[in-house]
Amino acid sequence: MYSIIIDGRDENFPCSPDDSLLRGGLRAGLGLPYECSTGSCGTCKFDLLDGKTENLWPESPGLSERDLRKDRRLACQNRPLGDCTIKMRIDPDATPKILPRRKLVRLVESRQLTHDMREFRFEAESKAEFLPGQYALFTLPGVTGLRAYSMANLSNDAGAWDFHIKNMQGDDGSHALFDGVVAPGQKVEM
């Protein structure tokens, strides 16, 4: 774990080398502003003042030419390579009400809803805690990057996570789920 210091504030947070600065900060309960978590919106911009990060998507559409000239980065697309000091806006309204956590979930069921849409049910060993409108990020076998899917059920103590997912041609995430790369009984990281 690396220590990420937010310049001008008393806050710092631990961040794993295989996690983005955004997810590390949210897991620590900090109000880091974001919208998409995928590099498209630019809401999670920061300045790297000290240390090094790995930029996972240097040509992300969330950064303007001006941002690139000023060496701004996106917290959702940068992983720490050591301890860092960053300058980033903190928004108390963005403080997570439920802290995001990594967990292994097991695919227990897949059922066809329409010709191109299925419901996938995953189960975790802990309860399923989330708010309406939130989404989960999946690491799927054979897929580069994370895939975001919105939950189709409600928080529950049973640990059930339901997703209604459309089969998108040419999408590796759809392929992994619809073509059986992820089979019932298999665990994936969420």
Predicted regions and their residues:
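N-terminal pre-ligand scaffold of iron-sulfur
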Residues: M1-L32
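Short acidic, glycine-rich loop/turn motifs
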Residues: I5-G8, L48, L140-G142
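Short, conserved secondary-structure segments in the cores of folded domains
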Residues: E11, L32, S37, S126, ...
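Residue-level "contact hotspot" at macromolecular interaction interfaces
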Residues: P14, E35, R79, E129, ...
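Iron-sulfur (Fe-S) cluster-binding segments and ferredoxin-like electron-carrier domains
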Residues: S20, G24-P33, T43-P92
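Ferredoxin-reductase
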Residues: L99-Q186
